[in-house]
């Protein structure tokens, strides 16, 4: 969760087995380096769903994804007002 006033992400850690319900985001560049910004929702064994920014994960069996490559370049830049890496087309 990103706190705009603090300009800081507050990470949550979820442990145990989960199934991916949704995974969406972008892979682009910041200052010429690859940068991913992913959001994930995942359900535990009882069906409770948790979610947020995906910083790291370990896949135990499979992870099916569709990746769409677009023509052109999308970069990001650091916005000083919000502290976020915003799109630059």
Residue map of PLM features:
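N-terminal intrinsically disordered, cationic/polar leader segments
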Residues: 1-36, 41-89
């Amino acid at each position: 969760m990103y706190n705009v006033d603090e300009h800081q992400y507050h990470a949550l850690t979820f442990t145990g087995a989960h199934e991916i319900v949704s995974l969406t985001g972008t892979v682009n560049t910041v200052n010429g380096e690859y940068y991913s910004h992913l959001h994930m929702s995942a359900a535990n064994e009882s069906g409770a769903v948790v979610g947020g920014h995906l910083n790291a994960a370990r896949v135990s069996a499979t992870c099916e994804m569709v990746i769409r490559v677009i023509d052109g370049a999308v970069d990001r830049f650091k916005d000083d007002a919000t502290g976020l890496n915003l799109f630059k087309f």
